[in-house]
UniProtKB/Swiss-Prot annotation:
Recorded coiled-coil stretches: none
Main location per the UniProt record: cytoplasm
Compartmental location: Cytoplasm; Nucleus
Top-level taxon of origin: Eukaryota
Region of interest (UEV-like 2), residue spans: 275-364
InterPro entries the record matches: BRE
Name by which UniProt lists this protein: BRISC and BRCA1-A complex member 2
Regulation: induction: Down-regulated by DNA-damaging agents in fibroblasts, by retinoic acid in brain glioma U-251MG and promyelocytic HL-60 cell lines, and by bacterial lipopolysaccharides (LPS) in peripheral blood mononuclear cells (PBMC).
Key words of the record: Acetylation, Apoptosis, Cell cycle, Cell division, Chromatin regulator, Cytoplasm, DNA damage, DNA repair, Mitosis, Nucleus, Phosphoprotein, Repeat, Ubl conjugation pathway
Residue span of region UEV-like 1: 30-147
PANTHER family named in the record: BRISC AND BRCA1-A COMPLEX MEMBER 2
Protein's gene: BABAM2
GO MF, any single term: tumor necrosis factor receptor binding
Amino acid sequence: MSPEVALNRISPMLSPFISSVVRNGKVGLDATNCLRITDLKSGCTSLTPGPNCDRFKLHIPYAGETLKWDIIFNAQYPELPPDFIFGEDAEFLPDPSALQNLASWNPSNPECLLLVVKELVQQYHQFQCSRLRESSRLMFEYQTLLEEPQYGENMEIYAGKKNNWTGEFSARFLLKLPVDFSNIPTYLLKDVNEDPGEDVALLSVSFEDTEATQVYPKLYLSPRIEHALGGSSALHIPAFPGGGCLIDYVPQVCHLLTNKVQYVIQGYHKRREYIAAFLSHFGTGVVEYDAEGFTKLTLLLMWKDFCFLVHIDLPLFFPRDQPTLTFQSVYHFTNSGQLYSQAQKNYPYSPRWDGNEMAKRAKAYFKTFVPQFQEAAFANGKL
């Protein structure tokens, strides 16, 4: 159900509270998922004119789970705070004295419900952490992370239900990784969606038993960061080592991700240097180039009255990854009607060269390769 459809069914006096939740409500570490509501119902009599829904189920993303809490207002007394039912978490009993925004409920503040939900989620986190006491190993993992503020202050924990047969229970740690994405080139962060939310990397680590014999890590990147780093398949994190600890494993993943970000940033500046060198060396031979991301360059060159194009595609992780050179005849066509071309990656190249050296080496390579390309174009293409 879309937020607009849901709000149209809510009692008008309660609508500001719910609007703040579904339109602006982001609670916890997962900034890519908003709060949402379902199961709208009314406690009013059938004679009450609509819209009159005053109770609903609130879906809250937390530690890779979705909490489903029932929130019950009274449309006849909209100035009163709501009641809460915590669904499957019957053991979760919040401390009323710690719910400041519920105790001092202010119906003139449209964010009062959202503020109460945030306080409840904080208490729910403490409730889940306390459940780890049933396992000394999981408690050790939690306490060692807690001692490091960069991890302990950005962590959610969900302790699963105890297995009736084995007495074991699973637990999931969700951590917001302290990786700086602020220097990623802005062109890589475009065109994902209108409201991408916070740029964030979350590491989920699931312990399927209390002795950590089955541990499954997974990395989640917000849409813009995933796009900027080359897609979901571009980053593979290591398996959790047997006998390993989170306090050792999490920094490894942070280091891996930080290096990936640095590769992207370095690639952007190196591509810009590369294209600047080609502009200097080839001058009027430059037909066009990508002036934003510096990922493409096209040259129009001549060798003994034979004109040809060279399309240069620079990869995301340049200079580590070698550019592709595509030679294209301006005279000859393939059977499908396309200009005859050949792509080359087997040419002199070193990622240690600066842009000027790469341009000089490319110019020398063009002179040696063009004669055989011209011959192939005449042999395989049509005028």
